[in-house]
Amino acid sequence: MKNMEQIDFVVTWVNDKDVDWCKRKSEFEKEYNIFQDLNSEERYREWGLMKYWFRAVEKYAPWVNKIYFITEGHVPNWLDVNHPKLVHVKHEDYIEKQFLPTFNSNVIEMNLIHLKDLSEKFVLFNDDFFINDFVKQSDFFENNLPKDTGIFSPLIPRENSLTPIILNNMEIINKYFSKKKILEQNFSKFFNIKYGKHLLKNICLLPWSDLLGFYDNHIPVSYCKSNFLEVYEKEHAIFNLTFKNKFRNKNEINHWLIRYWQLSSGNFIPRNINFGKNYAISNDPTDIINELKLSKYKIICINDGESIDNFDAVKGLMINAFEKKFPEKSSFEKK
């Protein structure tokens, strides 16, 4: 790998048990006509797995430069905020005061353009994304380009989905990019055997001249900070509209817009589709527990299922499975 610069990780976290935070959230919910399908309680629910996120990073990605741990202000009581690789960032440290407080993950993530010390190359995690096996820098960046999958996928409207937000992203992408030119300039990046059966999607969508959407596999995204800045300069109005939303709203954008921009620009290197997998937690998390044992995928997303009947019981099973996989404390934990 040539000219590889340092790579940072960024992860966002919320403590839904923080009394003050819950009180403020409740007060603002009364003022705003929020979309429940985009702001359900499950989207804020904390599973007690954050310490295992750090243990996984230390074990499987010790090469990481800095970890930007972004919160409203609270930190887990076990976290050593003085760790040399850890940068604890409060919302007030990089988001303009006029947009605070915010309970909108899109505001938190899209404001990364204002995080001055963040490396040009970084990987954005949600707190439900876990490294599940040894990874290299080249799994995320190669020749200074992000690793990703250039797979087309039409948008399908579903209840309780992000489709309205993704549609806003795609409207901007179609404003600046021509599918014909994308394929003329980067054909091999979109028709690549690394995509496996998903390659059929690109073949089937060839007759359509417009970009109908991209496949989102819900794993950490590799970003170049300069791409965030480029899109912000061109579309600052929609950024600022998003920043004003205290809660997620159907009129805004999310960070996938920058991912789509990188894909449409050809500024990426194709990555094997089996690098990561998205799992939805259900009443029976056996498939996730088995994945933790077998490590078939290097990255996993453990997506909160909104139909869990016994949250505490399932949470206990998950914590037990992670404890078995990562029994040793990381250096990010207080002694």
UniProtKB/Swiss-Prot annotation:
Superkingdom of source: Bacteria
Keyword Acyltransferase applies: no
One Pfam family hit: Stealth_CR2
InterPro entries xrefs: Stealth, Stealth_CR2
GO MF annotation list: transferase activity, transferring phosphorus-containing groups
Extra remark beyond the main annotation: Stealth proteins are part of a protein family that is conserved from bacteria to higher eukaryotes. Family members were first identified in microbes as proteins that help pathogens to elude the host innate immune system. Microbial stealth proteins are involved in the biosynthesis of exopolysaccharides. Stealth proteins are predicted to function as hexose-1-phosphoryltransferases.
Descriptive protein name: Capsular polysaccharide phosphotransferase WcwK
Organism: Streptococcus pneumoniae
